[in-house]
From Swiss-Prot:
The protein, known as: Myosin light chain kinase family member 4
Catalyzed reaction equations: L-seryl-[protein] + ATP = O-phospho-L-seryl-[protein] + ADP + H(+); L-threonyl-[protein] + ATP = O-phospho-L-threonyl-[protein] + ADP + H(+)
GO biological process, one term: signal transduction
Keyword Transferase among record annotations: yes
Length: 388
């Protein structure tokens, strides 16, 4: 595989924003070229898939060389503490007609993020002083408004500590404002690319457990996220390992009898069925979970190419491996976990419930061993510092 850009350079290259890097594949010709290429070169496709065997587990609705983003990492002791719930009870929200400023003070200077939709500002409820986040979404017509109202409907159905919660909503002529739970830890993506942030396999386990718990809840509610990526996962604060999944703008209600197809998403996280414009379902999110696990463990993006076409090519060929030196000290359980998710045939991928039962996320003996190794590495690093 060709050497690819650093992930932070990739973001700039695609001229997109951290909270909403959408790539809408309206030009289907590029995908068709990739598919034609693969049909001619599919002889050894299965040997590249990163797994030798897999079984179908989706009957239950419960449900080339890559450039490293950073060097090898170690960190302080990780503590498995659940993410705190929102500072308010779950509520059913409908968009009110009127101005958000009548009830909230929206900061013009504290901008938390932004993208195709508009911007997210820090805000405060006037009556209570509750700190919140206001996502201001520009709406140019009825279609835009219906998309935002779908996001509201989705969030109304989701009540879980690892999913950001909706507090209020306001509709005016040119925009809809979603007032949401506020967290200040930044994006998980920032921790991947931050050279000063130390991340271990045990830290990754803590993140992945929470991601899978949030996705399991979504799937139990028959909702697909369809845009899972580190930019759409926020850390509760700067130091802890608790996370919350955000951005349900592309989420869809899954109805088994109604075959759903989508043609949106961020290229490097797309499942093969999205690239092929085939039917999507719960396993589509789990592919993205596999990509996130791969990135957290190694600092590498498994399918990222120099351009969209090359990235889609890699995805359709299911061309990935665990041979990079960044995986040298990673446990076999972690490698097996990834291999059960990055599978081209979606029915063979493990579900969120199965992922949480996998030894990598559930074996306390493994976690104790990784913790002991982390302490040993910390002591070794400290000794090296003293020697120098």
């Amino acid at each position: 595989m060709l050497k690819v850009k650093r992930l932070e350079e990739f973001n700039t290259c695609y001229n997109s924003n951290q909270l909403e890097k959408m790539a809408f594949f309206q030009c289907r010709e590029e995908v068709e070229k990739v598919k034609c290429f693969l049909e001619k070169n599919s002889g050894d496709q299965d040997s590249r898939s990163g797994h030798n065997e897999a079984k179908e587990v989706w009957s239950n609705a419960d449900l080339t060389e890559r450039m490293p983003v950073k060097s090898k990492r170690t960190s302080a002791l990780a503590v498995d503490i659940p993410a705190p719930p929102a500072p308010f009870d779950h509520r059913i929200v409908t968009a009110k007609q009127g101005a958000v400023n009548s009830f909230y003070t929206v900061s013009k200077t504290e901008i938390l993020g932004g993208g195709r939709f508009g911007q997210v500002h820090k805000c405060e409820e006037t009556a209570t002083g509750l700190k919140l986040a206001a996502k201001i979404i520009k709406t140019r017509g009825m279609k835009d408004k219906e998309e935002v109202k779908n996001e509201i409907s989705v969030m109304n159905q989701l009540d879980h500590a690892n999913l950001i919660q909706l507090y209020d909503a306001f509709e005016s002529k040119n925009d809809i404002v979603l007032v949401m739970e506020y967290v200040d830890g930044g994006e998980l993506f920032d921790r991947i690319i931050d050279e000063s942030y130390n991340l271990t396999e045990l830290d990754t386990i803590l993140f992945m457990k929470q991601i899978c718990e949030g996705i399991r809840h979504m799937h139990q509610m028959y909702i697909l996220h369809l845009d899972l990526k580190p930019e759409n996962i926020l850390c509760v604060n700067r130091d802890a390992k608790q996370i919350k999944i955000i951005d349900f703008g592309l989420a869809r209600r899954y109805k088994p009898r109604e075959k759903l197809k989508v043609n949106f998403g961020t290229p490097e996280f797309l499942a093969p069925e999205v690239v092929n414009y085939d039917f999507v379902s719960f396993p589509t999110d789990m592919w993205s979970v596999g990509v996130i696990a791969y990135m957290l463990l190694s600092g590498l993006s498994p399918f990222l190419g120099d351009n969209d076409a090359e990235t889609l090519n890699n995805i359709l060929a299911c061309r990935w491996d665990l041979e990079d030196e960044e995986f040298q000290d990673i446990s076999e359980e972690a490698k097996e976990f990834i291999s059960k998710l990055l599978i081209k045939e979606k029915s063979w991928r493990i579900s969120a419930s199965e992922a949480l039962k996998h030894p990598w996320l559930s074996d306390h003996k493994l976690h104790s061993r990784l913790n002991a190794q982390k302490k040993k590495n910390r002591g070794s690093d400290a000794q090296d510092f003293v020697t120098k």
